[in-house]
A protein has these predicted regions:
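Small-aliphatic-rich amphipathic alpha-helix that forms the alpha element of a beta-alpha
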Residues: 38, 57-110
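Residue-level signal for well-ordered alpha-helical positions
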Residues: 22, 52-53, 110
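Short secondary-structure junction motifs
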Residues: 2-5, 94, 120
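C-terminal helix-cap and adjacent tail motif
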Residues: 55-57, 118-149
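A glycine-rich helix N-cap at a beta->alpha junction
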Residues: 28-33, 37-40, 113-134
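Short, well-ordered secondary-structure micro-motifs
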Residues: 18-20, 49-51, 133-136
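N-terminal amphipathic, basic helical "cap/leader" segment at the start of enzyme domains
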Residues: 1-47, 148-149
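Short Gly/aromatic-enriched secondary-structure transition segments
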Residues: 4-6, 52-56
């Protein structure tokens, strides 16, 4: 209900150049060449919008001036929103490569200098060719990651 996710679309070459210093070496080339890059961020003051979206007048007090609680909530809920965003992109036929391999502090300084928004992850968006896709790395099995009580 808090809807803290914000997306900054980096379309122009100039915006990509601003992002370049924050990219890891392994993500540099593919990000600079992607048709569109989404910088998925979260609003640390998302609570300001709660009166419009949440039918409990006290909701704003749950997060205003609550420090780490507000930050963790914004990050967690924006990450959940980001997962659904990826599903939506794929549902309309787009290929997307989500990545966390970048320097968040550098990206924040370049795009969100006032500190209200904070970077979460990047998504390269476009129509892939299938070239250069490496086999998926092994994954932990269900038995290793889940249990029932």
């Amino acid at each position: 209900n808090s809807q803290p996710m914000r997306i900054l679309y980096l379309r122009s070459p100039e915006s990509r150049e601003r992002l370049r210093p924050s990219l890891s070496a392994t993500n540099l080339d593919k990000t600079m060449k992607a048709p569109l890059v989404a910088l998925v961020a979260y609003d640390t003051q998302f609570w300001e919008h709660l009166p419009r979206m949440f039918h409990n007048p006290a909701a704003i007090t749950w997060f205003k001036d609550k420090g780490a609680h507000t930050e963790i909530t914004a990050f967690r809920n924006a990450t959940l929103q980001g997962g659904y965003y990826l599903l939506a992109l794929r549902a309309v036929g787009l290929d997307c490569g989500a990545m966390s391999g970048f320097d968040l502090a550098k990206a924040d300084a370049a795009f969100f200098p006032d500190g209200r928004l904070k970077s979460n992850f990047l998504v390269n968006i476009g129509y892939g060719t299938g070239k250069g896709i490496v086999p998926r790395n092994p994954r932990l099995g269900f038995e290793e990651t889940c249990r029932f009580l």
